[in-house]
Design a protein with these regions (language model features):
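Short, basic/aromatic recognition patches that contact phosphate-bearing ligands
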Residues: 1-63
Length: 63
């Protein structure tokens, strides 16, 4: 899976669940946590309003 497809799939996963942990994303796509953090940063830089909290996970901000 290329990066664009993976980042899109991560966005869909974030839209379908209230909170998603980085480890869940890493396990689902067979990638490292560092790659998850880079992909999340790419989503944020493209304008997706994300909230992340250590030990809790990532979610899309409402509003």
């Amino acid at each position: 899976m290329n990066r664009i497809d993976r980042v899109t799939a991560i966005l869909i996963q974030l839209q379908s669940k209230r909170v998603v942990k980085a480890q869940e994303i890493a396990d689902r796509f067979g990638i490292s946590l560092r790659t998850v953090y880079r992909d999340i940063k790419a989503l944020e830089e493209s304008g997706v309003p994300l909230a992340g909290e250590a030990g809790v996970g990532y979610s899309i901000m409402e509003g």
